[in-house]
Amino acid sequence: LVGKAVRFVLWALVAGLWALPVPLAASQRVQLVRVGLLAGRPEVVLSADAPLRVLDVQADRQEQLSTGAWAFRAATGGIEVPGVARYGPVVRVSAEGDRPVRVEDRLRAYRGVVELRRTEAGLTVVNEVDLESYLYGVIKLEINPAWPAEAVKAQAVAARTLAVASLGRFAREGYDVRDTTDSQLYGGVTFEDPRATAAVDATRGLVLLHGGQPILAVYHADSGGRTESSEHVWGRAYPYLRGVEDPYVSGSPYERWTLSLPTGQLEEVLRRAGLPAREVRSVEVAETSESGRALRLRFSGPEGAWELSGHRLRTLLGPDVLRSTLFTVRVEGAAVVFEGRGWGHGVGMSQWGARGMALRGWDFVRILQHYYTAVQVGARP
C-alpha cells in the first residue's frame, strides 16, 4: 500500500465476537482491471449518451465523435470508422462526463474505457475499469443481491480476491479476466444493483489473504452438504481450499436433483473423450473423495471396462447438465440415471451455505473464514 498502513479496529472486544476490518479509505491505490468482452469481431458498434472520445494509442491523438452510435471496423493495419476516421491498431474509447459506453454487440454499457484492439482475427473488445467498479457489475450475476447483506458482502470479498489473484491471467490476449464463467460473470453498468453496490462499498479494498497474498477465492452455488478439497478438482492442493462441512444450506433448489441421460448420448460423450464406448451396459462410482464426490467412474460394455474422472465427465457433459460430481449413478433401461446434490465444483465458498449462515447471524468475516481455511481478511496488497 502507498502511504500509511491500513488501520483496523475491533468491531467488538467481547470474547466470541469477530473482529471486522474497516473498509479501506478512498486514498488507496486504484487497481485497474482489463476485462475481455469480445474477440474476432469484424465490426463493433459503440455508443453513449454523450460525445465519444477516441484516443489513437499509436498516434497519441485524441478525437471526438458526436453523441450517437458509431461502427468501428477492422481495417488493414488498424481500425476505421467508415467515412469518418482511420486509426492505428489500438483505440481507447470513453464518453464525456464519464458516462458509460455501450457495446451494442453485448447489449451492455460499461464504466471506464472500452478498448478496441486490431488482431489477425478481427477486433478484440476490452473494458478497462477500476476494481471496485468492476465488482459492481459482477455481484448481481454471481449471487442474489436480495439475500442477507452479510452473505452478499462475503461474495463481494471473495469476488474481489479472485479478481486480484487473476490479474494477468489472459495477458497474451490483451486483458486480465473474461466476462464469463472462465473468470467471473460481469455485466457492466447494465447489471449493477444498489444492494450489490452497497456490499462492495461496505467491504472496499478487503481481500482474503494467506501468507500475506490474495488467495484463489473460488466459489460455487451449493456444496450439497460438504465442500471439496482443491486437489480433487484441479489436481493441486491449496492450503486454504480444504473440504469443510456445510450444514446450513436450506431452501436451495439444487439440494437434490436427478438427471436421466440416454445411454446413446453418454456413449457419444465418452467417444469424444477418446474412450472405446460403443455400448455402455453398466456404470459405477469407483472412487469417492472425503466429501463423497465421484473421483473415478467405471464404465463397462462388450469392449471391456474403462474409467473416467468425475470432473472430466462433468466437463464433457457440461456443468449445467451434470450439476455436480456428488452423485450416485446407475443404468436403468436405455438411460443412465444420476441422482445428486448441489451445484458447482464444490471448492471454496458455497453461496447457498453463506446465505444460511447469514440468516443465522454470522457476519461476512466469519462466513469467509469457515470456507477458506487459515485466511485473514485484510487490505489488498
Question: At which residue positions do the language-model features occur?
Answer:
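Conserved, single-site charged/polar hotspot
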Residues: A5-L13, A19-P381
